Swiss-Prot record:
GO terms for cellular component: plasma membrane. Its EC number is 2.5.1.42. The chain crosses the membrane at residues 14-34, 40-60, 92-112, 146-166, 202-222, 224-244, 256-276. Keywords: Cell membrane, Lipid biosynthesis, Lipid metabolism, Magnesium, Membrane, Phospholipid biosynthesis, Phospholipid metabolism, Transferase, Transmembrane, Transmembrane helix. InterPro entries: DGGGP_synth, Prenyltransferase_related, UbiA_prenyltransferase, UbiA_sf. This is Digeranylgeranylglyceryl phosphate synthase. Its cofactor is Mg(2+). It is an enzyme of class 2 (transferase). It catalyses: sn-3-O-(geranylgeranyl)glycerol 1-phosphate + (2E,6E,10E)-geranylgeranyl diphosphate = 2,3-bis-O-(geranylgeranyl)-sn-glycerol 1-phosphate + diphosphate.
Length: 276
């Protein structure tokens, strides 16, 4: 067993990014920074929950990761599967204890999100499109969690919609990237059932819906600061163009990475709109 595997299996960069998005969601909702204690708790609840979700996901994905992600801790033998299971439960417990310290609404949403993560990894992930929707919903809930924690919605509701839509696109394109390993496991993802080209159409559709939804805050009389979203929309459209043109593994990887980047950039754009 490698001690570094306890950090590596959580995919810390993703978790820290999720924590930042949760915190930024609270700022977008309020229009200013929350009190330091609440800000720290929001960041920790989202970060630790994401770590637990990634760990339990690797526990259930052991066989498929032997093909798609052999470098990860479980396939390469750096951590035992049972250890990973217990570790994920510990992370979830710590996250919920921290959520309880915020308010009852943050605790309830935390319970819903954590349970959903477990059920997704256990049963929902192989289901065509259902798994994509669940992951996208969890991503959309990340900035929304920050808003719930400060008991104010503001622009965070619009941000959650955009985060959900762009993540549906990203998850479908990720399935195109991982189609070889998914077929070996017997998973029934959208690209396997419909073919990569049709799946690409679905991904592109949700990318376009994201761009359309990104203009919803204009209805709320948001100031000129919201124009920061325009470059993000262009990035989303470029990612959609790439996967529409070519569904090879390398292209799908690049497209979904660009969409992942767009999520964080969208949060920053909404942040600018909220405080300007």
């Amino acid at each position: 067993m490698e001690l570094k595997a306890f950090i590596e299996i959580t995919r810390p960069h993703n978790c820290i990014l999720a924590g930042i998005v949760g915190l930024l969601g609270s700022i977008v909702a309020l229009g200013h920074f929350p009190d330091p204690k609440t800000a720290l708790l929001i960041f920790l609840v989202v970060t630790v929950g994401c770590a637990g979700g990634n760990t339990i996901n690797d526990y259930f994905d052991y066989e498929i990761d032997k093909i798609n992600r052999p470098e990860r801790p479980l396939p390469r033998g750096a951590m035992g599967r049972k250890v990973a299971l217990y570790y994920s439960m510990l992370l979830f417990a710590v996250g919920l204890a921290l959520a309880y310290m915020i308010n009852i609404y943050a605790f309830i949403l935390g319970v819903i999100a954590y349970v959903t993560m477990f059920i997704y990894a256990w049963k929902l992930k192989p289901l065509p499109f259902v798994g994509n929707i669940v992951v996208a919903g969890l991503t959309g809930a990340t900035p929304l969690y920050g808003a719930v924690a400060v008991e104010h919605l503001g622009l965070a509701g619009y941000l959650a919609i955009c985060a959900f839509l762009v993540n549906v696109a990203r998850e479908v394109i990720k399935d195109i990237e991982d189609v070889e390993g998914d077929m070996a496991k017997g998973a029934k993802t959208l690209p396997i059932i419909w073919g990569k080209k049709r799946a690409a159409y679905v991904g592109v559709l949700f990318a376009l819906l994201t761009v359309i939804a990104s203009f919803l805050p204009v209805k709320a009389s948001v100031g000129v600061g919201y124009y920061a979203m325009v470059p993000v929309d262009l990035l989303i459209l470029y990612a959609a163009y790439l996967i529409l043109r070519n569904q090879d593994r390398e292209v799908a990887h690049k497209s979904q990475k660009l969409l992942k980047m767009s999520i964080f950039l969208a949060v920053m754009a909404f942040l600018i709109a909220a405080i300007v």
